[in-house]
Amino acid sequence: MLRLHDTALGHSRELKTREPGRIGLYICGSTVYGPPHIGHGRFSLVYDVLRRFLEYSGFVVDHVSNVTDIDDKIIGRANEEHRQPEEIAERYEAEWWEAMSTLGCLPPTQVPHATAFIEEMVEIVAELVALGSAYETSDGVYFAVSAVDDYGLLAHQSLASLRSGARVEVNDKKRSPLDFALWKKAKPAEPWWASPWGPGRPGWHTECVVMSLALLGEGFDLHGGGQDLVFPHHENERAQAVALGKPFARRWMHNGMVEARGGEKMSKSLGNVLTLSDLFEQSDPRAYRLLALQSHYRAPIEVTATTLSDAVSALGRLDALSGRLAEAGGVDSERGDPEVRDAFVERMQDDLDTPGATAILFDAIRRANVAFDAREAPRAAELTRGVLECFGAVGLEAKGAAEIPEAVLELGHRRDRARAERDFATADALRAEIVALGYAVEDTSSGTRIRR
């Protein structure tokens, strides 16, 4: 049974879903005002791995991830570029999905846009006002955090301690520094929608609570995002649901942040943000997935030229093993090693212990190579297929095997036969033919190995 860490509880517990065999995930998605960076990539990979493993385990996954297509940052970027906010949102959303595709992330089953749920947001805000949990001011409608007795549950802090340490925008119109905007009254030249409080637009925290409840229903299974969203965003979502008397997420999951060299936090203000497009120019996109797998999802991850290079080298071992399986050809065993699979699943079920699971698979790669070298092809194939199946379950596919055409592999087999018959002139000619086609040839104890 899969156990996952629950942020609200502070420890791991068994995953029990609302409906047996089915799970609803709401993952806070992108605010589309700039190019996606490696921080976005990290959280996308974390939840892609979660979804894939759930599906591998037999679950039907309802994966909802929103697009915030109206926000202060989008408006700010539009003003900078002298464009309309919707132009900015459309442009950067397209970049987002292109980057996610390159990373190999599965598209969510539903992608709600904030601007498509304005009517529902107005209804929720009006209900909160009617309940006395929200109040109108000259610049908008605010939620009163004092309306929720356990405000601070996700942050594991009391309301008093949150108030004393509050780092929020100063606004003398609010009753408390922690009160947050549900509806923002329109400023000149800003997009707006009609409401009982005049023209305006929803606050960020209102958007996600409305979309998650609308698409997954009350008491949905899991709400996820980065650790930077625990407070205030997710705390504020939860507070609205509590005030409305609506069961909200049954479990909260948060991933660690990306760090630059030396543990320095990655941020735009420090000028150390690496966009995903820059990353893809520097490295195989699969290397970032492997790097993410080698780090526990709740731990910070350091992304440097060195860590990416190490991941590329490790990928080379996976690709080479896949190539050896293709070169072996005609091996009867079509199944993966069950011990490898069972050990992999056991580690993954322990709060997605991807570092432990990955270590098991790379040890299996080592053992498979030993078996290939010893000409134990069936055992080597069984281990290799186990490795490929398990890595495939978390979205990491080997390259190499499928890229070498059968005709080229046949040249290698002919070369092996020539060498066995001590026809070295023919073997050398076949080697030259393979090299001329753009492939490298290695002589191993198990025969000719061909690589790109």
Segments and roles (model prediction):
Residues 55, 129, 435:
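Anion (oxyanion) recognition and catalysis
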Residues 59, 133, 439:
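Short phosphate-binding/catalytic loops that engage adenosine nucleotides
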Residues 9, 18-104, 450:
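N-terminal, positively charged nucleic-acid-binding surface of large information/translation enzymes
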Residues 264-267, 272-452:
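Structural preference for alpha-helix termini/caps and helix-kink/transition segments
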Residues 107, 137-138, 443-447:
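Short Gly/Ser/Thr- and Asp/Glu-enriched loop/turn motifs at secondary-structure junctions
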Residues 109-116:
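Phosphate-binding beta-loop-alpha motif at adenosine-nucleotide cofactor sites
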